[in-house]
Amino acid sequence: MAGRGKAIGSGAAKKAISRSSKAGLQFPVGRIARFLKAGKYAERVGAGAPVYLAAVLEYLAAEVLELAGNAARDNKKTRIVPRHIQLAVRNDEELSRLLGMVTIASGGVMPNIHNLLLPKKAGGSKAVAADDDS
């Protein structure tokens, strides 16, 4: 039966290529697929779903890390700490909306001084005229 299948032990073994490397991603596609199946989100999980989810998660992580790195550099630091992540997320409109109800541990609060508490600007002739009327 020549030409039927491969003989056992013949030829070089093929090196396994991960689905992450096939998709050009750093996040683990296989692990995400396993979590999707184990989580019972659906009875069946398509082949492209874990790849797409891994790509989305990788993009979000890269976006947050880039903004947090900028916040760390603005504060003259070389290490990203939770405070930098908090500043990055809350200063970005879309990320702030996405993570609106999320508490970042050790993130602190956003610096904010109410306008009424700020000192009044000198030389405001309109403000003086308004006070004279009342």
From Swiss-Prot:
Q: In which tissues is it expressed?
A: Expressed in meristematic and non-proliferating tissues.
Residue runs in coiled coils: none
Name the InterPro entries for this protein.
Answer: Histone-fold, Histone_H2A, Histone_H2A/H2B/H3, Histone_H2A_C, Histone_H2A_CS
What biological processes does GO assign it?
A: heterochromatin formation
Subcellular compartments = Nucleus; Chromosome
Which PROSITE patterns has this protein been placed in?
A: HISTONE_H2A (PS00046)
Q: Which UniProt keywords apply?
A: Chromosome, DNA-binding, Nucleosome core, Nucleus
Record protein name field: Protein H2A.7
Q: Name one GO cellular component term.
A: nucleus
Q: Which PANTHER family match?
A: HISTONE H2A
Q: Name one Pfam family in it.
A: Histone_H2A_C
| Assembly and interaction partners | The nucleosome is a histone octamer containing two molecules each of H2A, H2B, H3 and H4 assembled in one H3-H4 heterotetramer and two H2A-H2B heterodimers. The octamer wraps approximately 147 bp of DNA.
Task: Give me the segments passing through the membrane.
Answer: none
According to its UniProt entry, what is the function of this protein? Core component of nucleosome. Nucleosomes wrap and compact DNA into chromatin, limiting DNA accessibility to the cellular machineries which require DNA as a template. Histones thereby play a central role in transcription regulation, DNA repair, DNA replication and chromosomal stability. DNA accessibility is regulated via a complex set of post-translational modifications of histones, also called histone code, and nucleosome remodeling.
For this chain, one GO molecular function annotation is:
structural constituent of chromatin
Q: Which SMART domains match?
A: H2A
Write out the similarity annotation.
Belongs to the histone H2A family.
SUPFAM superfamilies, alphabetized:
Histone-fold
Is-annotated flag, keyword rRNA processing? Answer: no
Keyword RNA-binding annotated: no
